[in-house]
Protein backbone atom coordinates (compact mmCIF):
# COMPACT_ATOMS: atom_id res chain seq x y z
CA UNK A 1 0.00 0.00 0.00
CA UNK A 2 1.40 3.30 -0.97
CA UNK A 3 1.36 6.04 1.65
CA UNK A 4 0.11 9.52 1.37
CA UNK A 5 2.53 11.83 -0.41
CA UNK A 6 3.14 15.57 -0.13
CA UNK A 7 3.00 17.58 -3.35
CA UNK A 8 3.61 21.11 -4.56
CA UNK A 9 2.57 23.20 -7.59
CA UNK A 10 -0.29 22.41 -9.96
CA UNK A 11 -2.49 19.35 -9.46
CA UNK A 12 -1.71 16.56 -11.94
CA UNK A 13 -4.93 14.89 -13.08
CA UNK A 14 -5.16 11.35 -14.50
CA UNK A 15 -4.40 11.24 -18.20
CA UNK A 16 -7.23 8.77 -18.88
CA UNK A 17 -9.93 8.99 -16.23
CA UNK A 18 -12.28 6.74 -18.25
CA UNK A 19 -10.90 3.59 -16.70
CA UNK A 20 -11.69 4.79 -13.22
CA UNK A 21 -15.24 5.74 -14.19
CA UNK A 22 -15.92 2.14 -15.29
CA UNK A 23 -15.02 0.92 -11.83
CA UNK A 24 -17.59 3.08 -10.07
CA UNK A 25 -20.91 1.69 -9.00
CA UNK A 26 -24.15 3.24 -10.40
CA UNK A 27 -24.63 4.96 -7.08
CA UNK A 28 -21.35 6.76 -7.68
CA UNK A 29 -22.41 8.32 -10.99
CA UNK A 30 -22.40 12.04 -11.78
CA UNK A 31 -26.10 12.44 -11.05
CA UNK A 32 -25.79 10.76 -7.65
CA UNK A 33 -22.71 12.82 -6.81
CA UNK A 34 -24.33 16.14 -7.72
CA UNK A 35 -27.65 15.54 -6.01
CA UNK A 36 -26.53 13.68 -2.90
CA UNK A 37 -28.30 15.26 0.05
CA UNK A 38 -25.27 15.10 2.34
CA UNK A 39 -22.71 16.33 -0.19
CA UNK A 40 -21.29 19.72 0.83
CA UNK A 41 -20.47 22.33 -1.77
CA UNK A 42 -17.03 23.15 -3.10
CA UNK A 43 -15.16 26.03 -1.51
CA UNK A 44 -12.20 27.95 -2.82
CA UNK A 45 -11.37 29.19 0.65
CA UNK A 46 -7.95 30.33 1.75
CA UNK A 47 -7.21 26.88 3.25
CA UNK A 48 -8.05 25.15 0.02
CA UNK A 49 -4.48 23.89 -0.44
CA UNK A 50 -4.94 21.69 2.62
CA UNK A 51 -7.77 19.89 0.88
CA UNK A 52 -5.49 18.97 -2.03
CA UNK A 53 -2.20 18.45 -0.22
CA UNK A 54 -2.71 14.77 0.39
CA UNK A 55 -3.58 12.07 -2.11
CA UNK A 56 -5.33 9.00 -0.81
CA UNK A 57 -4.39 5.47 -1.71
CA UNK A 58 -6.82 3.40 -3.77
CA UNK A 59 -9.59 1.91 -1.61
CA UNK A 60 -9.47 -1.81 -0.96
CA UNK A 61 -11.88 -3.96 -2.84
CA UNK A 62 -11.61 -2.06 -6.11
CA UNK A 63 -9.79 -3.81 -8.93
CA UNK A 64 -7.69 -1.60 -11.14
CA UNK A 65 -5.42 -2.20 -14.07
CA UNK A 66 -1.63 -2.35 -13.83
CA UNK A 67 -1.42 0.99 -15.62
CA UNK A 68 -3.74 2.60 -13.13
CA UNK A 69 -1.86 1.02 -10.21
CA UNK A 70 1.47 2.29 -11.57
CA UNK A 71 0.36 5.81 -10.72
CA UNK A 72 0.29 4.78 -7.09
CA UNK A 73 -2.51 7.14 -6.06
CA UNK A 74 -5.71 8.83 -7.03
CA UNK A 75 -6.77 12.21 -5.76
CA UNK A 76 -8.68 12.42 -2.54
CA UNK A 77 -11.88 13.58 -4.25
CA UNK A 78 -11.82 10.57 -6.60
CA UNK A 79 -11.16 8.15 -3.78
CA UNK A 80 -13.90 9.57 -1.64
CA UNK A 81 -16.38 9.34 -4.47
CA UNK A 82 -15.36 5.77 -5.22
CA UNK A 83 -15.65 4.81 -1.58
CA UNK A 84 -18.99 6.53 -1.08
CA UNK A 85 -17.61 9.13 1.30
CA UNK A 86 -17.81 12.89 1.37
CA UNK A 87 -15.51 14.65 -1.05
CA UNK A 88 -15.02 17.85 0.94
CA UNK A 89 -14.91 18.88 4.55
CA UNK A 90 -18.00 20.04 6.38
CA UNK A 91 -16.80 23.65 6.56
CA UNK A 92 -16.99 24.16 2.81
CA UNK A 93 -20.76 24.40 2.47
CA UNK A 94 -21.38 28.11 2.97
CA UNK A 95 -18.95 29.54 0.46
CA UNK A 96 -20.49 28.02 -2.67
CA UNK A 97 -24.11 27.93 -1.53
CA UNK A 98 -26.19 29.39 -4.31
CA UNK A 99 -28.02 32.46 -3.12
CA UNK A 100 -31.73 32.52 -4.03
CA UNK A 101 -32.79 35.12 -6.56
CA UNK A 102 -35.91 37.18 -7.23
CA UNK A 103 -36.30 38.66 -10.72
CA UNK A 104 -32.67 37.74 -11.39
CA UNK A 105 -31.37 39.66 -8.35
CA UNK A 106 -29.93 37.94 -5.29
CA UNK A 107 -32.01 38.21 -2.14
CA UNK A 108 -29.02 39.57 -0.21
CA UNK A 109 -28.76 42.39 -2.75
CA UNK A 110 -32.49 43.12 -2.59
CA UNK A 111 -32.23 43.36 1.20
CA UNK A 112 -29.95 46.34 0.61
CA UNK A 113 -31.53 47.93 -2.45
CA UNK A 114 -35.18 47.94 -1.34
CA UNK A 115 -34.59 49.63 2.06
CA UNK A 116 -32.23 52.14 0.45
CA UNK A 117 -34.88 52.98 -2.13
CA UNK A 118 -37.47 53.45 0.62
CA UNK A 119 -35.07 55.64 2.58
CA UNK A 120 -34.46 57.81 -0.47
CA UNK A 121 -38.23 57.99 -1.02
CA UNK A 122 -38.81 59.31 2.50
CA UNK A 123 -35.86 61.74 2.39
CA UNK A 124 -36.86 63.26 -0.95
CA UNK A 125 -40.55 63.39 0.05
CA UNK A 126 -39.57 65.51 3.03
CA UNK A 127 -37.15 67.62 1.01
CA UNK A 128 -39.80 68.51 -1.58
CA UNK A 129 -42.26 69.63 1.09
CA UNK A 130 -39.57 71.64 2.88
CA UNK A 131 -38.22 73.18 -0.33
CA UNK A 132 -41.63 74.30 -1.58
CA UNK A 133 -42.59 75.67 1.84
CA UNK A 134 -39.44 77.61 2.74
CA UNK A 135 -39.62 80.07 -0.18
CA UNK A 136 -43.28 80.84 0.44
CA UNK A 137 -42.59 81.41 4.14
CA UNK A 138 -39.77 83.92 3.76
CA UNK A 139 -40.97 85.68 0.58
CA UNK A 140 -44.60 86.27 1.58
CA UNK A 141 -43.98 87.16 5.24
CA UNK A 142 -44.84 90.65 6.41
CA UNK A 143 -41.92 93.03 5.94
CA UNK A 144 -40.06 90.65 3.65
CA UNK A 145 -39.72 90.01 -0.09
CA UNK A 146 -37.73 87.97 -2.59
CA UNK A 147 -34.70 90.16 -1.89
CA UNK A 148 -34.15 88.24 1.32
CA UNK A 149 -33.13 85.03 -0.47
CA UNK A 150 -29.64 86.07 -1.70
CA UNK A 151 -28.81 87.45 1.75
CA UNK A 152 -30.02 84.26 3.41
CA UNK A 153 -27.93 82.03 1.18
CA UNK A 154 -24.79 84.12 1.55
CA UNK A 155 -24.79 85.35 5.14
CA UNK A 156 -26.80 82.70 7.01
CA UNK A 157 -26.90 79.44 5.10
CA UNK A 158 -23.21 79.28 4.22
CA UNK A 159 -21.87 80.03 7.76
CA UNK A 160 -24.21 77.45 9.26
CA UNK A 161 -23.14 74.88 6.67
CA UNK A 162 -19.47 75.50 7.45
CA UNK A 163 -20.17 75.23 11.17
CA UNK A 164 -21.99 71.96 10.64
CA UNK A 165 -19.10 70.57 8.58
CA UNK A 166 -16.62 71.40 11.33
CA UNK A 167 -18.86 69.76 13.92
CA UNK A 168 -19.46 66.73 11.70
CA UNK A 169 -15.72 66.28 11.14
CA UNK A 170 -15.13 66.31 14.90
CA UNK A 171 -17.98 63.88 15.56
CA UNK A 172 -16.80 61.49 12.82
CA UNK A 173 -13.56 60.99 14.78
CA UNK A 174 -15.25 60.10 18.07
CA UNK A 175 -18.58 58.46 17.18
CA UNK A 176 -19.41 55.25 15.42
CA UNK A 177 -21.18 55.45 12.07
CA UNK A 178 -24.51 54.44 13.62
CA UNK A 179 -24.26 56.95 16.45
CA UNK A 180 -23.20 59.66 13.99
CA UNK A 181 -26.23 59.00 11.78
CA UNK A 182 -28.73 59.28 14.64
CA UNK A 183 -26.91 62.26 16.18
CA UNK A 184 -27.30 64.20 12.93
CA UNK A 185 -30.82 63.28 11.81
CA UNK A 186 -32.70 63.42 15.12
CA UNK A 187 -32.26 67.22 15.62
CA UNK A 188 -33.80 67.79 12.18
CA UNK A 189 -36.85 65.71 13.07
CA UNK A 190 -37.27 67.47 16.42
CA UNK A 191 -36.89 70.96 14.91
CA UNK A 192 -39.42 70.52 12.10
CA UNK A 193 -41.97 69.14 14.53
CA UNK A 194 -41.35 72.03 16.93
CA UNK A 195 -41.64 74.60 14.15
CA UNK A 196 -45.06 73.44 13.02
CA UNK A 197 -46.57 73.08 16.49
CA UNK A 198 -44.69 75.67 18.60
CA UNK A 199 -42.59 78.23 16.75
CA UNK A 200 -44.95 79.24 13.96
CA UNK A 201 -48.03 79.67 16.20
CA UNK A 202 -45.88 81.89 18.48
CA UNK A 203 -44.20 83.79 15.63
CA UNK A 204 -45.98 87.05 16.47
CA UNK A 205 -44.47 86.92 19.95
CA UNK A 206 -40.92 85.85 19.11
CA UNK A 207 -40.32 88.08 16.05
CA UNK A 208 -38.87 91.55 16.89
CA UNK A 209 -41.01 93.43 14.38
CA UNK A 210 -41.00 96.74 16.29
CA UNK A 211 -37.21 96.82 16.46
CA UNK A 212 -36.95 95.93 12.77
CA UNK A 213 -39.32 98.77 11.86
CA UNK A 214 -37.21 101.31 13.79
CA UNK A 215 -33.98 100.12 12.18
CA UNK A 216 -35.55 100.18 8.73
CA UNK A 217 -36.72 103.76 9.24
CA UNK A 218 -33.20 104.73 10.32
CA UNK A 219 -31.13 102.83 7.74
CA UNK A 220 -33.41 103.12 4.73
CA UNK A 221 -35.12 100.64 2.40
CA UNK A 222 -31.88 99.36 0.86
CA UNK A 223 -31.32 97.39 4.09
CA UNK A 224 -34.73 95.73 3.94
CA UNK A 225 -33.22 92.34 3.02
CA UNK A 226 -30.75 92.06 5.93
CA UNK A 227 -33.29 93.49 8.38
CA UNK A 228 -35.89 90.98 7.22
CA UNK A 229 -33.60 88.19 8.41
CA UNK A 230 -33.80 89.59 11.93
CA UNK A 231 -37.51 90.39 11.61
CA UNK A 232 -38.56 86.83 10.71
CA UNK A 233 -35.64 84.92 12.21
CA UNK A 234 -37.64 81.75 12.92
CA UNK A 235 -38.75 81.54 9.28
CA UNK A 236 -35.16 82.09 8.19
CA UNK A 237 -34.03 79.31 10.50
CA UNK A 238 -36.62 77.05 8.88
CA UNK A 239 -35.23 78.07 5.48
CA UNK A 240 -31.69 77.15 6.51
CA UNK A 241 -32.72 73.85 8.11
CA UNK A 242 -34.62 72.93 4.94
CA UNK A 243 -31.51 73.70 2.88
CA UNK A 244 -29.34 71.66 5.24
CA UNK A 245 -31.76 68.73 4.98
CA UNK A 246 -30.94 68.54 1.29
CA UNK A 247 -27.17 68.76 1.71
CA UNK A 248 -26.76 66.86 5.00
CA UNK A 249 -29.41 64.14 5.06
CA UNK A 250 -29.47 63.46 1.32
CA UNK A 251 -25.81 63.86 0.41
CA UNK A 252 -23.89 62.99 3.57
CA UNK A 253 -26.10 60.59 5.52
CA UNK A 254 -27.92 58.68 2.79
CA UNK A 255 -25.23 58.50 0.12
CA UNK A 256 -22.54 57.88 2.72
CA UNK A 257 -24.57 54.96 4.06
CA UNK A 258 -25.26 53.66 0.54
CA UNK A 259 -21.56 53.79 -0.33
CA UNK A 260 -20.80 51.89 2.86
CA UNK A 261 -23.04 48.87 2.17
CA UNK A 262 -22.87 48.57 -1.64
CA UNK A 263 -20.14 47.40 -3.97
CA UNK A 264 -19.06 49.20 -7.13
CA UNK A 265 -20.87 46.69 -9.35
CA UNK A 266 -24.07 47.10 -7.35
CA UNK A 267 -23.69 50.87 -7.48
CA UNK A 268 -23.38 50.92 -11.26
CA UNK A 269 -26.52 48.83 -11.59
CA UNK A 270 -28.73 50.23 -8.85
CA UNK A 271 -27.63 53.78 -7.99
CA UNK A 272 -29.53 55.27 -10.94
CA UNK A 273 -32.57 53.27 -9.86
CA UNK A 274 -32.48 54.63 -6.30
CA UNK A 275 -33.91 57.81 -7.74
CA UNK A 276 -36.95 56.00 -9.12
CA UNK A 277 -38.45 55.67 -5.67
CA UNK A 278 -37.23 59.17 -4.85
CA UNK A 279 -39.01 60.69 -7.81
CA UNK A 280 -42.18 58.79 -7.13
CA UNK A 281 -41.90 60.61 -3.79
CA UNK A 282 -41.37 63.86 -5.69
CA UNK A 283 -44.61 63.31 -7.60
CA UNK A 284 -46.63 62.49 -4.49
CA UNK A 285 -45.10 65.27 -2.40
CA UNK A 286 -45.88 67.74 -5.17
CA UNK A 287 -49.50 66.62 -5.05
CA UNK A 288 -49.40 66.98 -1.25
CA UNK A 289 -48.20 70.59 -1.48
CA UNK A 290 -50.85 71.32 -4.11
CA UNK A 291 -53.56 69.82 -1.89
CA UNK A 292 -52.63 71.92 1.14
CA UNK A 293 -52.36 75.02 -1.05
CA UNK A 294 -55.94 74.55 -2.18
CA UNK A 295 -57.02 73.79 1.38
CA UNK A 296 -55.60 77.10 2.59
CA UNK A 297 -57.57 78.85 -0.13
CA UNK A 298 -60.86 77.27 1.00
CA UNK A 299 -60.54 77.74 4.77
CA UNK A 300 -61.98 81.24 4.87
CA UNK A 301 -60.73 84.62 6.04
CA UNK A 302 -60.90 83.93 9.78
CA UNK A 303 -58.61 80.92 9.79
CA UNK A 304 -54.82 80.97 9.56
CA UNK A 305 -54.34 78.59 6.67
CA UNK A 306 -50.58 78.45 7.05
CA UNK A 307 -50.87 77.29 10.67
CA UNK A 308 -53.22 74.46 9.71
CA UNK A 309 -51.21 73.33 6.71
CA UNK A 310 -47.85 73.57 8.47
CA UNK A 311 -49.04 71.33 11.30
CA UNK A 312 -50.19 68.72 8.80
CA UNK A 313 -47.09 68.89 6.61
CA UNK A 314 -44.66 68.93 9.54
CA UNK A 315 -46.44 65.89 10.96
CA UNK A 316 -45.76 64.13 7.67
CA UNK A 317 -42.12 65.24 7.79
CA UNK A 318 -41.69 63.87 11.32
CA UNK A 319 -43.33 60.57 10.38
CA UNK A 320 -41.08 60.16 7.36
CA UNK A 321 -38.04 60.99 9.51
CA UNK A 322 -38.91 58.24 11.96
CA UNK A 323 -39.36 55.83 9.05
CA UNK A 324 -35.85 56.74 7.84
CA UNK A 325 -34.42 55.90 11.26
CA UNK A 326 -36.23 52.55 11.30
CA UNK A 327 -34.98 51.60 7.83
CA UNK A 328 -31.43 52.53 8.81
CA UNK A 329 -31.69 50.36 11.93
CA UNK A 330 -33.13 47.43 9.96
CA UNK A 331 -30.39 47.45 7.32
CA UNK A 332 -27.64 47.61 9.96
CA UNK A 333 -29.32 44.78 11.86
CA UNK A 334 -30.04 42.33 9.04
CA UNK A 335 -27.80 43.17 6.05
CA UNK A 336 -24.09 42.17 6.09
CA UNK A 337 -21.57 44.74 4.94
CA UNK A 338 -19.52 43.94 1.82
CA UNK A 339 -15.86 43.06 2.23
CA UNK A 340 -13.52 45.54 0.61
CA UNK A 341 -9.84 45.34 -0.12
CA UNK A 342 -7.75 47.00 2.54
CA UNK A 343 -5.87 50.09 1.45
CA UNK A 344 -2.16 49.79 2.04
CA UNK A 345 -1.95 53.29 3.43
CA UNK A 346 -3.94 53.68 6.65
CA UNK A 347 -4.51 57.33 7.40
CA UNK A 348 -4.49 58.46 11.05
CA UNK A 349 -7.18 60.59 12.57
CA UNK A 350 -6.77 64.24 11.65
CA UNK A 351 -7.98 67.44 13.21
CA UNK A 352 -10.28 69.87 11.45
CA UNK A 353 -7.57 72.01 9.87
CA UNK A 354 -5.51 68.96 8.91
CA UNK A 355 -8.59 67.47 7.25
CA UNK A 356 -9.21 70.64 5.25
CA UNK A 357 -5.56 70.84 4.18
CA UNK A 358 -5.62 67.22 3.08
CA UNK A 359 -8.80 67.69 1.07
CA UNK A 360 -7.52 70.85 -0.60
CA UNK A 361 -4.29 69.08 -1.56
CA UNK A 362 -6.13 66.24 -3.32
CA UNK A 363 -6.76 66.82 -7.06
CA UNK A 364 -9.50 64.19 -6.95
CA UNK A 365 -11.42 66.01 -4.21
CA UNK A 366 -10.82 69.38 -5.87
CA UNK A 367 -12.40 68.16 -9.10
CA UNK A 368 -15.37 66.78 -7.17
CA UNK A 369 -15.73 70.11 -5.39
CA UNK A 370 -15.63 71.92 -8.74
CA UNK A 371 -18.52 69.82 -10.00
CA UNK A 372 -20.66 70.58 -6.94
CA UNK A 373 -19.84 74.32 -6.81
CA UNK A 374 -20.34 74.73 -10.56
CA UNK A 375 -23.77 73.13 -10.40
CA UNK A 376 -24.79 75.30 -7.46
CA UNK A 377 -23.73 78.54 -9.15
CA UNK A 378 -25.18 77.62 -12.54
CA UNK A 379 -28.60 76.55 -11.32
CA UNK A 380 -28.74 79.55 -8.97
CA UNK A 381 -28.02 82.04 -11.74
CA UNK A 382 -30.97 80.72 -13.73
CA UNK A 383 -33.30 79.82 -10.86
CA UNK A 384 -33.30 83.17 -9.06
CA UNK A 385 -34.03 84.99 -12.30
CA UNK A 386 -36.88 82.56 -12.94
CA UNK A 387 -38.28 83.00 -9.41
CA UNK A 388 -38.39 86.76 -9.89
CA UNK A 389 -40.60 86.19 -12.94
CA UNK A 390 -42.63 83.64 -11.01
CA UNK A 391 -43.23 86.10 -8.16
CA UNK A 392 -44.43 88.70 -10.68
CA UNK A 393 -46.82 86.22 -12.31
CA UNK A 394 -48.15 84.64 -9.09
CA UNK A 395 -48.03 87.23 -6.26
CA UNK A 396 -50.50 85.32 -4.06
CA UNK A 397 -48.94 82.78 -1.66
CA UNK A 398 -51.65 80.24 -2.50
CA UNK A 399 -51.07 80.56 -6.26
CA UNK A 400 -47.29 80.55 -5.81
CA UNK A 401 -47.38 77.42 -3.65
CA UNK A 402 -49.85 75.65 -5.96
CA UNK A 403 -47.61 76.31 -8.96
CA UNK A 404 -44.61 74.97 -7.05
CA UNK A 405 -46.58 71.81 -6.29
CA UNK A 406 -47.24 71.31 -10.00
CA UNK A 407 -43.60 72.09 -10.71
CA UNK A 408 -42.43 69.41 -8.26
CA UNK A 409 -44.79 66.84 -9.77
CA UNK A 410 -43.53 67.54 -13.29
CA UNK A 411 -39.95 67.37 -12.05
CA UNK A 412 -40.66 63.96 -10.52
CA UNK A 413 -42.17 62.62 -13.75
CA UNK A 414 -39.28 63.91 -15.87
CA UNK A 415 -36.69 62.56 -13.45
CA UNK A 416 -38.44 59.19 -13.28
CA UNK A 417 -38.14 58.92 -17.05
CA UNK A 418 -34.50 59.99 -16.97
CA UNK A 419 -33.79 57.40 -14.30
CA UNK A 420 -35.02 54.65 -16.60
CA UNK A 421 -32.68 55.88 -19.32
CA UNK A 422 -29.71 56.51 -17.03
CA UNK A 423 -28.90 52.83 -16.51
CA UNK A 424 -28.52 52.47 -20.28
CA UNK A 425 -26.28 55.56 -20.36
CA UNK A 426 -23.98 54.17 -17.64
CA UNK A 427 -23.84 50.74 -19.27
CA UNK A 428 -23.34 51.95 -22.84
CA UNK A 429 -21.20 55.07 -22.45
CA UNK A 430 -19.69 54.88 -18.96
CA UNK A 431 -19.14 57.30 -16.09
CA UNK A 432 -17.51 60.09 -18.10
CA UNK A 433 -20.35 60.66 -20.58
CA UNK A 434 -22.95 60.44 -17.82
CA UNK A 435 -21.11 63.10 -15.81
CA UNK A 436 -21.06 65.51 -18.76
CA UNK A 437 -24.76 65.30 -19.66
CA UNK A 438 -25.99 67.51 -16.79
CA UNK A 439 -23.82 70.57 -17.59
CA UNK A 440 -24.69 70.22 -21.27
CA UNK A 441 -28.43 70.15 -20.56
CA UNK A 442 -28.18 73.10 -18.17
CA UNK A 443 -26.22 75.14 -20.71
CA UNK A 444 -28.64 74.54 -23.59
CA UNK A 445 -31.82 75.18 -21.60
CA UNK A 446 -30.26 78.19 -19.86
CA UNK A 447 -29.43 79.78 -23.19
CA UNK A 448 -33.06 79.28 -24.30
CA UNK A 449 -34.40 80.89 -21.11
CA UNK A 450 -32.11 83.91 -21.21
CA UNK A 451 -32.77 84.39 -24.91
CA UNK A 452 -36.53 84.59 -24.30
CA UNK A 453 -36.00 87.18 -21.56
CA UNK A 454 -33.57 89.31 -23.57
CA UNK A 455 -35.39 89.05 -26.90
CA UNK A 456 -38.96 88.62 -25.70
CA UNK A 457 -40.30 91.53 -27.78
CA UNK A 458 -40.01 89.88 -31.20
CA UNK A 459 -41.65 86.74 -29.80
CA UNK A 460 -44.66 88.61 -28.32
CA UNK A 461 -47.03 88.10 -31.32
CA UNK A 462 -46.24 84.39 -31.47
CA UNK A 463 -46.70 84.03 -27.72
CA UNK A 464 -50.03 85.90 -27.89
CA UNK A 465 -51.34 83.37 -30.41
CA UNK A 466 -50.66 80.68 -27.82
CA UNK A 467 -52.78 82.56 -25.28
CA UNK A 468 -49.86 83.66 -23.11
CA UNK A 469 -48.14 86.87 -22.20
CA UNK A 470 -44.35 87.17 -22.56
CA UNK A 471 -44.10 87.03 -18.76
CA UNK A 472 -46.08 83.79 -18.54
CA UNK A 473 -44.06 82.32 -21.40
CA UNK A 474 -40.83 83.15 -19.57
CA UNK A 475 -42.22 81.47 -16.45
CA UNK A 476 -43.04 78.28 -18.36
CA UNK A 477 -39.72 78.18 -20.23
CA UNK A 478 -37.86 78.76 -16.96
CA UNK A 479 -39.88 75.98 -15.37
CA UNK A 480 -38.92 73.62 -18.21
CA UNK A 481 -35.29 74.66 -17.81
CA UNK A 482 -35.38 73.85 -14.09
CA UNK A 483 -37.24 70.58 -14.67
CA UNK A 484 -34.75 69.27 -17.24
CA UNK A 485 -31.73 70.47 -15.26
CA UNK A 486 -32.92 68.97 -11.98
CA UNK A 487 -33.97 65.69 -13.61
CA UNK A 488 -30.50 65.39 -15.17
CA UNK A 489 -28.95 66.17 -11.77
CA UNK A 490 -30.99 63.57 -9.86
CA UNK A 491 -30.65 60.80 -12.46
CA UNK A 492 -27.05 61.30 -13.66
CA UNK A 493 -25.11 63.96 -11.74
CA UNK A 494 -25.83 62.65 -8.23
CA UNK A 495 -25.11 58.97 -9.04
CA UNK A 496 -21.90 59.98 -10.84
CA UNK A 497 -20.80 62.07 -7.88
CA UNK A 498 -21.50 59.29 -5.39
CA UNK A 499 -19.80 56.62 -7.50
CA UNK A 500 -16.68 58.78 -7.46
CA UNK A 501 -16.41 58.35 -3.66
CA UNK A 502 -16.42 54.55 -3.69
CA UNK A 503 -12.76 53.81 -4.62
CA UNK A 504 -11.46 56.31 -2.03
CA UNK A 505 -10.13 55.18 1.35
CA UNK A 506 -12.47 55.46 4.30
CA UNK A 507 -10.91 58.59 5.82
CA UNK A 508 -11.02 60.57 2.57
CA UNK A 509 -14.52 59.31 1.86
CA UNK A 510 -16.03 60.43 5.17
CA UNK A 511 -14.30 63.80 5.50
CA UNK A 512 -14.38 64.48 1.78
CA UNK A 513 -18.15 64.05 1.65
CA UNK A 514 -18.60 66.32 4.64
CA UNK A 515 -16.47 69.06 3.07
CA UNK A 516 -17.88 68.78 -0.46
CA UNK A 517 -21.56 68.14 0.16
CA UNK A 518 -22.06 70.33 3.21
CA UNK A 519 -19.76 73.24 2.32
CA UNK A 520 -19.40 73.21 -1.46
CA UNK A 521 -23.11 72.81 -2.11
CA UNK A 522 -24.06 75.97 -0.16
CA UNK A 523 -20.90 77.63 -1.47
CA UNK A 524 -22.19 77.17 -4.99
CA UNK A 525 -25.54 78.67 -4.09
CA UNK A 526 -23.95 81.49 -2.12
CA UNK A 527 -21.48 82.09 -4.92
CA UNK A 528 -24.35 82.52 -7.34
CA UNK A 529 -26.04 84.89 -4.89
CA UNK A 530 -22.85 86.95 -4.51
CA UNK A 531 -22.52 87.21 -8.27
CA UNK A 532 -26.10 88.42 -8.52
CA UNK A 533 -25.66 90.93 -5.71
CA UNK A 534 -22.58 92.32 -7.40
CA UNK A 535 -24.38 92.54 -10.73
CA UNK A 536 -27.40 94.28 -9.24
CA UNK A 537 -25.23 96.85 -7.46
CA UNK A 538 -23.18 97.41 -10.61
CA UNK A 539 -25.90 97.54 -13.28
CA UNK A 540 -28.85 98.71 -11.18
CA UNK A 541 -31.20 95.74 -11.53
CA UNK A 542 -31.36 92.04 -12.17
CA UNK A 543 -32.88 92.63 -15.61
CA UNK A 544 -30.00 94.88 -16.68
CA UNK A 545 -27.45 92.28 -15.58
CA UNK A 546 -29.11 89.38 -17.43
CA UNK A 547 -26.75 89.44 -20.48
CA UNK A 548 -23.69 89.33 -18.22
CA UNK A 549 -25.19 86.50 -16.18
CA UNK A 550 -25.48 84.52 -19.41
CA UNK A 551 -21.78 85.01 -20.15
CA UNK A 552 -20.84 83.97 -16.60
CA UNK A 553 -23.02 80.88 -16.97
CA UNK A 554 -21.11 79.89 -20.11
CA UNK A 555 -17.74 80.22 -18.35
CA UNK A 556 -18.80 78.22 -15.30
CA UNK A 557 -20.24 75.37 -17.37
CA UNK A 558 -16.99 75.23 -19.36
CA UNK A 559 -14.99 74.82 -16.11
CA UNK A 560 -17.51 72.19 -15.01
CA UNK A 561 -16.97 70.13 -18.17
CA UNK A 562 -13.17 70.38 -17.79
CA UNK A 563 -13.33 69.14 -14.18
CA UNK A 564 -15.58 66.25 -15.22
CA UNK A 565 -13.08 65.20 -17.88
CA UNK A 566 -10.17 65.34 -15.40
CA UNK A 567 -12.12 63.38 -12.80
CA UNK A 568 -13.02 60.73 -15.37
CA UNK A 569 -9.37 59.79 -15.86
CA UNK A 570 -8.63 59.69 -12.13
CA UNK A 571 -11.76 57.63 -11.41
CA UNK A 572 -10.91 55.04 -14.06
CA UNK A 573 -7.36 54.76 -12.71
CA UNK A 574 -8.53 54.16 -9.13
CA UNK A 575 -11.10 51.61 -10.26
CA UNK A 576 -8.43 49.71 -12.22
CA UNK A 577 -6.14 49.67 -9.17
CA UNK A 578 -8.91 48.41 -6.90
CA UNK A 579 -9.85 45.67 -9.36
CA UNK A 580 -6.19 44.61 -9.58
CA UNK A 581 -5.97 44.44 -5.77
CA UNK A 582 -9.05 42.22 -5.62
CA UNK A 583 -7.65 39.91 -8.30
CA UNK A 584 -4.34 39.63 -6.43
CA UNK A 585 -6.14 38.85 -3.17
CA UNK A 586 -8.22 36.14 -4.85
CA UNK A 587 -5.13 34.65 -6.51
CA UNK A 588 -3.15 34.56 -3.26
CA UNK A 589 -5.98 32.86 -1.33
CA UNK A 590 -5.94 29.62 -3.42
CA UNK A 591 -2.88 27.32 -3.59
CA UNK A 592 -3.25 24.00 -5.48
CA UNK A 593 -0.30 21.54 -5.27
CA UNK A 594 1.15 19.05 -7.83
CA UNK A 595 2.85 15.70 -7.80
CA UNK A 596 6.37 15.91 -6.48
CA UNK A 597 9.18 15.28 -8.93
CA UNK A 598 10.50 12.18 -7.18
CA UNK A 599 7.12 10.43 -7.57
CA UNK A 600 6.90 11.05 -11.31
CA UNK A 601 7.39 8.04 -13.57
CA UNK A 602 10.97 7.40 -14.62
CA UNK A 603 12.11 9.52 -17.51
CA UNK A 604 9.46 12.18 -16.98
CA UNK A 605 9.90 15.48 -15.21
CA UNK A 606 7.15 17.09 -13.16
CA UNK A 607 6.47 19.67 -15.82
CA UNK A 608 6.21 16.96 -18.47
CA UNK A 609 3.80 14.96 -16.34
CA UNK A 610 1.65 18.00 -15.66
CA UNK A 611 1.60 18.89 -19.32
CA UNK A 612 0.70 15.37 -20.31
CA UNK A 613 -2.13 15.04 -17.83
CA UNK A 614 -3.65 18.46 -18.40
CA UNK A 615 -7.10 18.10 -20.04
CA UNK A 616 -7.31 19.80 -23.41
CA UNK A 617 -10.89 19.28 -24.36
CA UNK A 618 -12.55 21.30 -21.63
Curated annotation (Swiss-Prot):
Ranges for region Disordered: 586-618
A Pfam family recorded for this sequence: TLC
Oxidoreductase is among the record's keywords: no
Keywords: Acetylation, ATP-binding, Chloroplast, Membrane, Nucleotide-binding, Plastid, Transit peptide, Transmembrane, Transmembrane helix, Transport
Membrane spanning residue stretches: 110-130, 148-168, 179-199, 237-257, 270-289, 312-332, 368-388, 401-421, 441-461, 464-484, 542-562
Transit peptide: 1-76
S-S pairs: none
Residues modified to N-acetylalanine: 77
Source domain of life: Eukaryota
GO MF annotation: an example: ATP:ADP antiporter activity
Biased composition regions of type Polar residues, renumbered to the chain: 603-618
Cellular component, GO annotation: chloroplast; chloroplast envelope; chloroplast membrane; cytoplasm; plastid
Membrane topology: Multi-pass membrane protein
Subcellular location: Plastid, Chloroplast membrane
Recorded family membership: Belongs to the ADP/ATP translocase tlc (TC 2.A.12.2) family.
Name listed for the protein in its UniProt record: ADP,ATP carrier protein 2, chloroplastic
Origin species: Arabidopsis thaliana
Lineage: Eukaryota, Viridiplantae, Streptophyta, Embryophyta, Tracheophyta
Amino acid sequence: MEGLIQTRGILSLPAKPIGVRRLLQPSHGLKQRLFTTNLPALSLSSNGHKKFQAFQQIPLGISVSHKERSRGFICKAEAAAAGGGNVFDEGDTAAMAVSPKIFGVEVTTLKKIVPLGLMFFCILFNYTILRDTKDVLVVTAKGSSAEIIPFLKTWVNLPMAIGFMLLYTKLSNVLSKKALFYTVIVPFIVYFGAFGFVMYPLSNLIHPEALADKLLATLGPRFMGPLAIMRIWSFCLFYVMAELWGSVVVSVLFWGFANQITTVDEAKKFYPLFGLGANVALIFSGRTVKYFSNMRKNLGPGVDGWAVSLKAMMSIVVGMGLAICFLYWWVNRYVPLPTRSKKKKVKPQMGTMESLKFLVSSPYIRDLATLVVAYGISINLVEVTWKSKLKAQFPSPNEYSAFMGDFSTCTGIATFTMMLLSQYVFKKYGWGVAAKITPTVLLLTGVAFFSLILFGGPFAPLVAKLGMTPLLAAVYVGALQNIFSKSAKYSLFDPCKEMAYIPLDEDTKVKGKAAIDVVCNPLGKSGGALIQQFMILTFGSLANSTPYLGVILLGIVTAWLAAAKSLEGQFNTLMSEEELEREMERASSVKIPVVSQEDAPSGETTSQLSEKSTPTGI
